[in-house]
Amino acid sequence: AEAGFDTHVIDQRDHVAGHCHSARDAETGVMEHVYGPHIFHTSNDAVWHYLQRFGEWMPFVNRVKARTARGIFSLPINLHTINQFFGTAMGPDEARAFVARLAAQDIDVPANLEEQALKFIGRDLYEAFFRGYTIKQWGCDPTELPADILKRLPVRFNYDDNYYDSRHQALPKHGYTRVVENILDHPRVHVTLATPWDAAMQREFAHVFHSGAIDACFGFSEGRLGYRSMHWQRSVHDGDYQGTAIINCPTLDVPWTRVLEHRHLSPWASCERSLVTHEFSKETEAGDLPFYPKRLAADRELLARYVARVEAQRNMTFIGRLGTYRYLDMHQVIADALDLARDWCAAHARGAPRPLFSRPPL
């Protein structure tokens, strides 16, 4: 729109902002992260400065805890976690050597998530913090998942319990939905809500940027890609329920993956009552909103067929987590979108082919 194009944004839901939608809970007055916690973090200054235009951002450090059979510990695994878990008082070098001795010595190149974990941290820490959580989150054995999933959870040999190491970490003071509404507040932008995408709509536009699931866009004609979906069990409590925003639950004795207390995601606000949601993961079925692309071997083979379908046309670009079938954080999606807008406008001005994806899906 800022480049002079009339833009029509269509969303199948009755609100903008997608999975990062936030809304004020009527019963408690707490700002709710409706589709689970979203903490913005980035070291990309261009992304950070772009977002400053559309809302007030409050500094926020995400300090996640894990409830295990041995007690509650900090994540990511850090020096405090290690000393507390093993009942030791090691320094950084001692702990590094200790974990190295725990690590599996017979795994050279990890073939899956379990082998990656065993190679990095050994069986005790893996069993306590990752195995059960992975089974519940992904609905399959960790040996069926690629090794690179575990790279999102580093081990630190200091007392830093900040979940992220990004330079900018914050939450929007008035919620993500307000930020997105401000982005869309432009005379060349028209928004239509509660309208599912239909292939016939494509004829109405010179170009379509599709952020929905790539397989759904083609009517699942090549088959369904694997996704995980989420659902939540809500409860309201007086006062402070758990003392922190997020507690992961990696044990298999409870079916939920984590517990979120929304008031702690707005620490600048004051509320007497507290909204708590227990989060559950499930396989995506017809009618479910997809959240996490699984990207198993069979999915990648199927994805290649959908990519070929995309490459056979020229007036549709697939964007975001679902459009590229990749696990992406918010800051990555925004960076990709800014880069894509620049590249698309440049290609349009030259009369050259437009980009087909905001990020290569394969």
Place the predicted regions along the sequence by residue.
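A conserved beta-strand/loop capping segment in the N-terminal third of enzymes
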Residues: 21-33, 40-94, 153-158
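Glycine-rich FAD pyrophosphate-binding loop
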Residues: 1-26
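Conserved beta-strand segments of alpha/beta enzyme cores
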Residues: 6, 31, 56, 188-192, ...
